[in-house]
Amino acid sequence: GSYKPNSLFIKRAKENENLKDVIFCNISFGDANSMVKELENLKIDTQNLIFSQVVSSYTNTSIKAVQEYQTLMKKYFPNAELGFLSFEAFLSSKILVNAISRITGDITREKLLLTLKTTPNNLLDGIPLEYKNSQLLNKTYLFEYKNRQFIELTNEK
């Protein structure tokens, strides 16, 4: 994935005296979990890293969809690490399976797209869905990596 070149860029930048304290922001497709692990393996400081995600924290068990994700991962993949990428894939799979199950008759591209556009807002138990701009997840979450965990950055004081 793109985390390796991103990690290499951050490594080289942090080795430069003029850039070592710069704040870096990685976009969600860059796999935050793998990037942090790569930087830690390279013995690079993981301070001043911000990650954007289209999903909430995979550790926030106050959200029912997170509880379900964690339960199923432990059951079927007990040795796998939890992460943003697998959580996003889990949510996407739930949406897709729901859409396919609501199609009557033959499954066609047109029917699938129409059904995806009418996904119930509450399907993901605590994660709001609304179809607009050709997507269902419309919130962006920002996290910083601190004390070996991802902490959500919020506007709240």
Q: Where in this protein do the model-derived segments appear?
A:
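A conserved active-site cap/scaffold subdomain adjacent to cofactor or substrate pockets
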Residues: 1-7
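Short phosphate-engaging motifs
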Residues: 5, 31, 92
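Extracellular/periplasmic periplasmic-binding protein-like sensory domains
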Residues: 10-87, 150-152
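Residue-level structural signal for beta-strand termini and adjacent loop
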Residues: 155-156
